[in-house]
UniProtKB/Swiss-Prot annotation:
Part of the 50S ribosomal subunit. Contacts protein L32. One of its GO terms (cellular component) is cytosolic large ribosomal subunit. Transmembrane segments: none annotated. Pfam families: Ribosomal_L17. Belongs to the bacterial ribosomal protein bL17 family. HAMAP family: Ribosomal_bL17 (MF_01368). The keyword Ribonucleoprotein applies. NCBIfam families: L17. GO terms for biological process: translation. It comes from Streptococcus thermophilus (strain ATCC BAA-250 / LMG 18311). It comes from the Bacteria. This is Large ribosomal subunit protein bL17.
Length: 128
């Protein structure tokens, strides 16, 4: 399997990919370097495919990769309680149902201007 090293050790690289994949699930669009965007695309496509399957095993596989971060939080005045949605819940309840008729190609990479400090090629990766 071919992949990009991204100038990091394997554990650091996996952590970066997990973080960026979780951020993309939560925000649905992020700005990063082109190389990272192309690597994130692979992991996000796999997570959405797991979300489309929707069974317990798929949910556990996705939970092993996606970070346990809060995607949204709301306050109910009647019960005086906060309710929150995690990135995994958002993946399975909001994002995956959008793509039931689509076979792959869930993300779009748009190239933008180079980063100011080091002229690294930047890109916006977003869910279609």
């Amino acid at each position: 399997m071919a992949y990009r090293k991204l100038g990091r050790t394997s554990s650091q690289r996996k952590a970066v990919l997990r973080d960026l994949t979780t951020d993309l699930i939560i925000n649905e669009a992020i700005v990063t370097t082109e190389a990272r965007a192309k690597e994130i695309r692979k992991t996000v496509e796999k997570m959405i495919t797991l979300g489309k399957r929707g069974d317990l095993h798929a949910r556990r596989q996705a939970a092993a990769f996606v970070r346990n971060e809060i995607a949204s939080e709301s306050y109910d005045e009647a019960t005086d309680k906060y309710t929150s949605t995690t990135a995994l819940q958002k993946l399975f309840s909001e994002i995956a149902p959008r793509y039931t008729e689509r076979n792959g190609g869930y993300t779009r990479i748009l190239k933008t201007e180079p980063r100011r400090g080091d002229a690294a090629p930047m890109a916006i990766i977003e869910l279609v």
